[in-house]
Amino acid sequence: MNPAHLLVLSAVCVSLLGASSIPPQPLHLVQFNGMIRCTIPGSIPWWDYSDYGCYCGSGGSGTPVDELDRCCQVHDNCYTQAQQLTECSPYSKRYSYDCSEGTLTCKADNDECAAFVCDCDRVAAICFAGAPYNKENINIDTTTRC
């Protein structure tokens, strides 16, 4: 086999091994990602919001660093409220919604939990779209800034 082909094949195999270690995202996060992309076309939500400020990403504490971080805090609080509903798990609940020209609508066929979670995500996506994105708030030291 040609050494160049062998090198390319090896690189592909290593890439695939790395990709297989990435855990799948819960369906709801895929839906929330879609909502954000509806309100902010061209955004890459997993990249842009997974480690922003004190509240965007997993966990959250302290004082939000800016308006966008406050959107994430409100979203976290909304999920806490959703968990008060009977058998409602906002991190895994699937819901139905439409996106039309940047406008999000939660569908009427959602059950109570799905409607609540859908609205949490809809409000957050709209909030993200209206908030400035400050690159200096990416990957901050949460022990000193939050």
Curated annotation (Swiss-Prot):
Disulfide-bond pairs as recorded:
C38-C99, C54-C146, C56-C72, C71-C127, C78-C120, C88-C113, C106-C118
* InterPro entries linked: PLipase_A2, PLipase_A2_Asp_AS, PLipase_A2_dom, PLipase_A2_dom_sf, PLipase_A2_His_AS
Q: In which tissues is it expressed?
A: Expressed by the venom gland.
Q: How is the cofactor bound?
A: Binds 1 Ca(2+) ion.
One Gene Ontology term of the biological-process aspect is: phospholipid metabolic process
**Key words of the record:** Blood coagulation cascade inhibiting toxin, Calcium, Disulfide bond, Hemostasis impairing toxin, Hydrolase, Lipid degradation, Lipid metabolism, Metal-binding, Secreted, Signal, Toxin
Q: Which domain of life is it from?
A: Eukaryota
Localization recorded for this chain is:
Secreted
Q: What is annotated as the active site?
A: H75, D121
Gene Ontology MF terms: calcium ion binding; calcium-dependent phospholipase A2 activity; phospholipid binding; signaling receptor binding; toxin activity
Q: What reaction gets catalysed by this protein?
A: a 1,2-diacyl-sn-glycero-3-phosphocholine + H2O = a 1-acyl-sn-glycero-3-phosphocholine + a fatty acid + H(+)
User: Propeptide ranges, please?
Assistant: 22-27
Cofactor(s) it depends on = Ca(2+)
Which N-terminal stretch is annotated as signal sequence?
1-21
Q: Give the enzyme's EC designation.
A: 3.1.1.4
Kindly list the GO CC terms recorded for this protein: extracellular region
Query: Where would you say this protein principally sits, based on its record?
Result: secreted
UniProt: Ca(2+) binding residues: Y55, G57, G59, D76
What CDD domains does UniProt report for this protein, alphabetically? PLA2c
> What is the purpose of this protein?
Snake venom phospholipase A2 (PLA2) that displays edema-inducing and moderate anticoagulant activities. PLA2 catalyzes the calcium-dependent hydrolysis of the 2-acyl groups in 3-sn-phosphoglycerides.
Record's family? Belongs to the phospholipase A2 family. Group I subfamily. D49 sub-subfamily.
Name the record gives this protein: Acidic phospholipase A2 2
The species this protein was found in: Ophiophagus hannah
